[in-house]
Curated annotation (Swiss-Prot):
One of its GO terms (molecular function) is metal ion binding. Its EC number is 5.4.2.12. GO terms for biological process: glycolytic process. Belongs to the BPG-independent phosphoglycerate mutase family. A-PGAM subfamily. The keyword Oxidoreductase does not apply. Gene3D superfamilies: Alkaline Phosphatase, subunit A (3.40.720.10). This is 2,3-bisphosphoglycerate-independent phosphoglycerate mutase. CDD domains: iPGM_like. The lineage of its organism: Archaea, Methanobacteriati, Thermoplasmatota, Thermoplasmata, Thermoplasmatales. Pathway: Carbohydrate degradation; glycolysis; pyruvate from D-glyceraldehyde 3-phosphate: step 3/5.
């Protein structure tokens, strides 16, 4: 008789890193004091996980889809719809959605892609640039800090267009270009929209006041990752188990909603450095009594990596580890996996193609000789897998896997 367990998958966003001189040529994970994750590594099964496949610089969206059992090469159609659905924006068939950032444009060049992580007046800015142009309706909703989503409704919209985001500072916003002849009219209307809203944002009272106070304005909307809602089976239909998520990032809430998973909110659990780690873990443990599978995402490690702050990333890992302690008493009924969705090295300040460490922890599995949870120790572990393998392994360890063959 196989014991059936619940599953908790904890994704520490952008966890993987590279050695830094400031940390004595160690990674933040190596330098951090994290006895609870080390305990799980010493009792569990560890190794390295490649996001998507070796050498791929995956996005958080594609890697999370893969971790949830969906091949992004088949199902991914852009992150825009996830952002919009995560902010409770309605999307009809044919609508086009984008990820968006409020940014700072000075003399035609982007000097800050996040407008100083603007976090006040965002709703007013979003409302001001929600306008109609002819037969096209543009709706913007603000998210966490500088982030927002844009949904466009109108005839014959195509997602085969480029981004306006130059993806680095010191460059002008890119004109929207069609990537297919059928997208010519979409590119044209998007360029017209971006032109009009620059004037609105430039003179908006929120930005005028920010400049008076010595703050940089959110006077540009950078858009990227255009997409329409994909035709995709629910998490339960595809995997045969019920699912829930405990996440702070709106786009990830949107993905989970799209997949029919329950979205459980936790007070103070935002997709930022200042998040309620303890609340997330305790909520996930409680949710595992009602759902077969619970996804937890903690964004803070990725934020520190993008900021290039080794010490902050080390401290964040230590704070997260404290919140992990209650999991150590649940191994008889829960299978826990801890990993990253990708690496965000502080030296790169962006995603890289490096593998990330992973640990599986529960009663009744064999353990390897690894005693520490970090990138280098994981090289000696039992596993060399990709994100696409993770759910299969979790299902098997939880006694939920279907037999392949007779």
């Amino acid at each position: 008789m196989i014991d059936v367990k619940s599953i908790i998958l904890i994704v520490l966003d952008g966890l993987g890193d590279r050695p830094g001189e400031i940390l004595g040529y160690r990674t933040p994970l190596q330098a951090a004091y994290h006895p609870n994750m080390n305990r799980m590594a010493s009792l569990g099964m560890t190794g390295l996980m490649h996001p998507i496949s070796p050498g791929i610089r995956s996005g958080s969206d594609t890697s999370h889809m893969s971790l949830l059992g969906y091949d992004p090469r088949v199902y991914y159609q852009g992150r825009g719809p996830f952002e919009a659905l995560g902010l409770h924006m309605d999307m009809k068939p044919g609508d086009l959605a984008f990820r968006a950032n409020f940014a700072t444009n000075r003399d035609g060049k982007i000097i800050d892609r996040r407008a100083g992580r603007i976090n006040a007046g965002n709703d007013q800015l979003a409302s001001a640039i929600s306008i109609d142009i002819g037969n096209y309706k543009f709706r913007v909703k603000s998210g966490v800090e500088h982030r927002a989503a844009l949904v466009v409704s109108g005839p014959n919209l195509s997602d085969k267009i480029s981004d306006s985001d130059p993806h680095s500072e010191g460059k002008p916003p890119e004109p929207i270009r069609p990537l297919d002849p059928s997208a010519d009219s979409t590119a044209k209307i998007m360029n017209e929209y971006l032109k009009r809203i620059r004037e609105i944002l430039r003179d908006h009272p929120v930005n005028v006041e920010r400049e008076k106070n010595g703050q940089i304005p959110g006077n540009e909307l950078l858009i990227r990752s255009a997409g329409k809602v994909p035709d995709i089976p629910s998490f339960q239909e595809k995997n045969g188990i019920t699912g829930a998520c405990v996440v702070g990032s709106p786009w990830l809430k949107g993905l989970c909603r799209l997949l029919g998973m329950a979205v459980i909110d936790v007070p103070g659990a935002a997709g930022t450095i200042n998040s309620n780690y303890t609340g997330k873990i305790k909520t996930a443990i409680d949710a595992s009594k009602r759902y077969d599978f619970v996804l937890v995402n903690i964004k803070a490690t990725d934020v520190a990596g993008h900021d290039g702050d080794y010490e902050l990333k080390r401290r964040v890992i230590e704070d997260i580890d404290i919140a992990m302690e209650p999991l150590l008493g649940q191994s008889d009924r829960i299978v826990v996996a801890i990993t990253g969705d990708h690496s965000t090295p502080c030296s790169v300040k962006d995603h890289s193609g490096d593998p990330v460490p992973i640990v599986f922890y529960t009663d009744g599995i064999y353990s390897d000789d690894v005693k520490l949870f970090d990138e280098v120790s994981a090289m000696k572990g039992a596993l060399r897998i990709t994100t696409q393998d993770v759910l299969n392994i979790l299902m098997e360890m939880a006694g939920r896997a279907e037999k392949f063959g007779s």
